[in-house]
Amino acid sequence: GVSGSCNIDVVCPEGNGHRDVIRSVAAYSKQGTMWCTGSLVNNSANDKKMYFLTANHCGMTTAAIASSMVVYWNYQNSTCRAPGSSSSGANGDGSLAQSQTGAVVRATNAASDFTLLELNTAANPAYNLFWAGWDRRDQNFAGATAIHHPNVAEKRISHSTVATEISGYNGATGTSHLHVFWQASGGVTEPGSSGSPIYSPEKRVLGQLHGGPSSCSATGADRSDYYGRVFTSWTGGGTSATRLSDWLDAAGTGAQFIDGLDSTGTPPV
């Protein structure tokens, strides 16, 4: 796939504050077709379980489909293509060599559009992965950062420098989603970005991409997207198969948020 030229390669300076969480994000295929984005998330035991958060609408909700998925790590361009340039809107040189196959469904719920998978194999040390923290507090944040695979192409980063807004999906009344507004000249999201994480200023996952009107050509309020909230997904539909709490805090610590875990095993400073 090819993503819009306004999007920003993760190797660009805009990624400098997020080098750790960039390594938690992956593209994946569904039954042989490049499909959506997801991310590796930490749990309160800090035990490197391969929990992978994506969107319910991506359809990774049956055992057969989950077993078919191939996850592609570190799929990104090697150089910073100037945003807006023709090269930024063309195929890059990202490699699909670092991959793993298969997952099981742990929990999913349409209300906040989340699916939590557990990948079948442990992390390959050569991939240098990162398990991102999360934040389930019921609040807005002063800004946010998205890391994603637009059109399931090379990994990109988009920053929001204004406060999030709690809402329903696509402007509906409700509290299940975070409405995130992109910079006028910065990156956005696209189909294929679905399921990708939105990070708080503290670099904790607040939710995953459901959708929205954003595109490189969008302006004003249309240059925005909606993310299903970890806050909502935490209790989900009230069962272990429809909520995050049983998996991301199996010990029942009651943590409101946790930080990420690097592949070296020590939590970041």
UniProtKB/Swiss-Prot annotation:
GO CC annotations, alphabetized: extracellular region
Entry GO MF terms: serine-type peptidase activity
Alphabetical keyword list: Disulfide bond, Hydrolase, Protease, Secreted, Serine protease
Broad class of where this protein is predominantly found: secreted
Top-level taxon of origin: Bacteria
Biotechnological relevance of this protein: Sold under the name 'Endoproteinase Lys-C' by Roche.
Annotated catalytic residues: 57, 113, 194
Any Pfam family: Trypsin_2
Localisation: Secreted
EC numbers, comma separated: 3.4.21.50
SS bonds (residue pairs): 6-216, 12-80, 36-58
InterPro entries assigned to the protein according to its UniProt record, in alphabetical order: Peptidase_S1_PA, Peptidase_S1_PA_chymotrypsin
Catalytic reaction(s) noted: Preferential cleavage: Lys-|-Xaa, including Lys-|-Pro
GO process terms (BP): proteolysis
Family the entry assigns: Belongs to the peptidase S1 family.
Function: Highly specific endopeptidase that hydrolyzes lysyl bonds including the Lys-Pro bond.
Protein name: Lysyl endopeptidase
Species lineage: Bacteria, Pseudomonadati, Pseudomonadota, Gammaproteobacteria, Lysobacterales
